[in-house]
Amino acid sequence: MFSKSMTIEQVDPDLWRAIQGEVQRQEDHIELIASENYASPAVLQAQGTVLTNKYAEGYPGKRYYGGCKHVDIVEQLAIDRLRALFNAEYVNVQPHSGSQANAAVYLSALKPGDTLLGMSLAHGGHLTHGAPVNMSGKIFNSIAYGLDPETEEIDYTELEQLAHEHKPRMIVAGASSYARVIDWQAFRKIADNVGAYLFVDMAHYAGLIAAGYYPNPVGIADFVTSSTHKTLRGPRGGVIMAKPEHEKALNSAVFPQTQGGPLMHVIAAKAVAFKEAASPAFKDYQKQVIENARVMARVLQQRGLRIVSGHTDCHMFLVDLRAKNLTGREAETALETAHITVNKNAIPNDPQKPFVTSGVRIGTPAITTRGFKELESEQLANLVADVLEAPTNEAVLDQVAREAQALCAKFPVYGN
């Protein structure tokens, strides 16, 4: 029999120290990685419940195990809330990640060798959109579209030309480092003209979409997937939304074709996050996320840095570091020393290797969760610029670290 009084610290002190180190890092470092956020205490609590003990292969009302009365309620809550949040018809909340949700979509609608038209990884796409190193680029005939070299926005003319030339079975829209509004209707029109499915991966934009600050692709695309962290601020996981005629194929693609038992504790945490995302406070939060990103981009431009495409419409943007004779890897290392966390990121047509890069990606979901507004975002952008101007100056790095820690202390992630 277990005692509820037993703690991780008592059972596994080595693991406890690692966890506490990460707790401290999250509290005293400013997080600017666009794909990261802080889950609420309620989301964390749901994910740490006894629901982790329950196997529930199948779907609510049709399980392969007994004892699923309560987990059926949990999963149905998540389903109903997700459906309402995005005005979806069919939803599946079981994918363990956004990438697995994408794999299930491909498995449900494509055959090996079918042509897939997705955004180039080098221009801001995602690995799972047909990159050669990913299974989506190995199993399917992957063709990539990209950005207009002048505007650094999606080149819809090229997209249409490629679609007519290659006649893809599926066109993928969505990105991992694209700061502008994506025209879902333009994608729909092109897909219809060549008889292709339209699949949207909205993982980065889901929270903004839920709040009404970014166009909703649900109902336009045949398939929509998302991760549940990032701007949606839930647990790490994935979801699928689609037109109802794809329900049977998608359910089968998730279980039993790509997954076994669903993670019921994670689905519970998703349900909490979906409820939080339907609140007025969440709408206000997403508005602030965009405002903070725009402030940071503007200040960095004023400090002599180039922002890819010149502007942002969402929670993130790319900074071109070539004018500073600095690589993304060098910038990432210097900023981390100064208690500011970013990720190195390729810019369009980047001459550097993927582990080096010529840019960094900056996102504001996490700092906005802390409570940063325009004033703090302006201060932070200037701190980032200070580091990028003197990445090896220890005095500058120490001063920026002190100011960053002061901001963190003023805006703790998890208060008392």
Curated annotation (Swiss-Prot):
Keyword Coiled coil: no
Binding-site positions, (6S)-5,6,7,8-tetrahydrofolate: L121, G125, H126, L127
GO biological process: glycine biosynthetic process from serine; tetrahydrofolate interconversion
Subunit structure and binding partners: Homodimer.
Site-annotated residues for Plays an important role in substrate specificity: H229
Entry's localization field: Cytoplasm
NCBIfam families associated with the record: PRK00011.1 (NF000586)
Gene Ontology CC entries for this record: cytosol
InterPro entries linked to this entry: PyrdxlP-dep_Trfase, PyrdxlP-dep_Trfase_major, PyrdxlP-dep_Trfase_small, Ser_HO-MeTrfase, Ser_HO-MeTrfase-like, Ser_HO-MeTrfase_PLP_BS, SHMT-like_dom
Record gene name: glyA
Pfam families cross-referenced by the UniProt entry: SHMT (PF00464)
Record-given protein name: Serine hydroxymethyltransferase
Function per UniProt: Catalyzes the reversible interconversion of serine and glycine with tetrahydrofolate (THF) serving as the one-carbon carrier. This reaction serves as the major source of one-carbon groups required for the biosynthesis of purines, thymidylate, methionine, and other important biomolecules. Also exhibits THF-independent aldolase activity toward beta-hydroxyamino acids, producing glycine and aldehydes, via a retro-aldol mechanism.
GO molecular function per UniProt: glycine hydroxymethyltransferase activity; pyridoxal phosphate binding
Alphabetical UniProt keywords: Amino-acid biosynthesis, Cytoplasm, One-carbon metabolism, Pyridoxal phosphate, Transferase
Family of this protein: Belongs to the SHMT family.
Cofactor: pyridoxal 5'-phosphate
Organism in which the protein naturally occurs: Nitrosomonas eutropha (strain DSM 101675 / C91 / Nm57)
EC number: 2.1.2.1
